[in-house]
Amino acid sequence: MTQSERAIVIGAGAGGLAAAIELTAAGYDVCVIEAANTVGGKMNQVVVEDHRIDTGPTVFTMRWVFESLFATLGYNLDDELHHSAMPILARHWWHNKTTLDLHADIDQSADAIGQFASSADAAGYRRFCADSESIHDTLRDTFMAAQKPNPLSLVHRVGWHRIGALMQTRSHQTLWHVLSQYFRDPRLQQLFGRYATYVGSSPLQTPATLMLIAHVEQAGVWRLEGGMSSLADAMQRVASSAGASFRLGERVDAITTRAGRVDGVITAAGEKLQADVVLFNGDNRALLQGLLGQSVQRPDRLQHSGQRGLSAITWSGLISAQQAPLSYHNVLFQEDYPSEFKRIFHQGELPHKPTVYVCAQDRERGGCPSAQERALVLINAPSVDTAAFNEDNVAEQAKLAVEAVIDRCGLDIKLNAGHVCRTPQWYSERFPGSGGSLYGGASHGMWSSFIRPGTRTRIPGLYRCGGSVHPGPGVPMATLSGRLAAWAMIEDRG
């Protein structure tokens, strides 16, 4: 590779930003083009009555990913990002103010589970933590932080002498089934089954391998000063310091090729920009649907388009909740968890009694700072192309369902006027090709991880990253996908 080689990154989500850092460190001339006026993709904020409120991901985990990334250009994460560990991972609510806190300390959580359910469930929790750590350790460097494998290459990476450990990742069993082997109390099965939604999936269909998410959270959840968008800002700042340029508020209409090889992009303004390599940081289906031009419409020899992952309906705004003992992360459950996913994935309907997530962004130190506080409220929803409801009244319908769940949990929470509501249709328009899914394809079935697209394509010079690409959705995983894409570029260019 020569110093003059130019890389264009389409999209400034976590993956695109991570790739920009890696590529500038390797000496590439990097230009990041983003349709929005801010970086971060789904890591975003809105302003309501002069308050900045997170609208997207709110959980910061896998700190090691970002420490390593920032160190690529000689930066220390602690110097660039103000963050603090959270002693309470989440507070969970059921009927009539029944609550359970999960703590960063396993012993505290086990004691809480023993009082909430039984000593047998507390013992089951300890086994669950040990097994989820084992799964995580087996797959961290062989799958998550490595290029997309096939089943055989994964066995080689793990090692034939550790085939037993690979079998214990439980990809052949569903998360919902395996949780019943640890917990007798159905509420605990519900609580830990929710980890499937972190990858946009149903616990009834996703492999039990996703237990590893429990260990990811147990290893640390941090609160970021300034919200998750401060992470995106820090990534942009680091990339810019090494020479990456950013063109915000500009859309790419097409990726161009010459003699079968990528040679640049055309912007919505009609400007042709030359490039030696192009990285697409967006939903892979945008390529498949021809939204970036016919010449790159078939990025893979075999095209897989499985079931879409979950979408969401969100409200970002101010709430009145002085009498509600909220934590920073709160989950409000209804009694029939499987019905939620059957309605979403099989009927394309909103759940009658949805699980409600409330991120009370002013509660990190306990207590309520004022009569009004910032919050993100979220429920799961079907993607646009599977939805069987009327988009015109879906927000009001969903709000009534949320209020019913809040009341049933015995909480006094009022969403004030002036909030910003986003629906599957909004997400579909903001992230082309996604159909409103926030996670790419659903992780349903034992082969889902191998069907997810890799960073390389069959078109020379074209790469991809993001939540719809290996290793999967979520800010840390999308960040890893960007790094993997950059490493693939560097390796292929020599």
Show the residue positions of the predicted features.
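Rossmann-like flavin
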Residues: 95-205
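A glycine-rich dinucleotide-binding beta-alpha-beta segment and adjacent secondary-structure elements
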Residues: 185-199, 353-357, 411-471
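Active-site-proximal substrate-binding core of FAD-dependent oxidoreductases
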Residues: 257, 490-494
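C-terminal segments that line or cap access tunnels to active or ligand-binding sites in enzymes
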Residues: 320-428
